[in-house]
Amino acid sequence: MASTDRSFDGSKVGTRLRSAREDRGISLRELARRVGVSPSLVSQIELDRVNPSVSTLYALVIELGMTMSDVFGDGPATQLIRARSDDDSLVARAETRRVINLASGVRWERLTPHSDPDVEFLHVMYPIGAESCPEDALVTHGGREYGYVMGGTLGVRVGFDEYELGPGSSIAFDSSSPHRLWTIGDQPAHAVWVVIGRAADPRAVSTAR
């Protein structure tokens, strides 16, 4: 497994979400109502005391008009400038990947060296028993997803269909279809995951609970 980026504090995800909410003049209770979770959960996430689930994070990002680059903590404009001048701008080193830790131990490592508004290129890790969201709270958003499982076994539900993906298996689907990921068996799972055009429909509905 890759190392955590020591220059990036993933625990500040909640701080970034709170700043975005306050900048937009949305109350904590109103944001919670829109997302469909309790105000106390939003408060705990903003204080970095609780990691959001994948579905809740997506719902918050959508409601706040953010991008995943905002969540990872960098801006596309400055990163594009750096990409033109940095000799190492094309490479994301294992020890300097940006990381987001989510509920139930799910972990995202960004595989692009800098932010890209059109593509989310991730190494996703699911410990034993982990899930992207509860069974009754599937997530939807704009874009299209592609996944390739490298280790362990992932369950993937898309709409009413469920798939079991072991090492070497891959999947592609429209992200607007309700979907969910979880670990199957007694081994952690990890995969390369790509989302293209998630921000294409910023008002896509997430069914987070």
Give, region by region, the residue ranges found by the protein language model.
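Short basic helix-loop element that most often maps to the first helix and adjoining turn
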Residues: T15-A32
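A short glycine-rich, His/Asp/Glu-containing loop-to-beta-strand
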Residues: A94-D136, W193
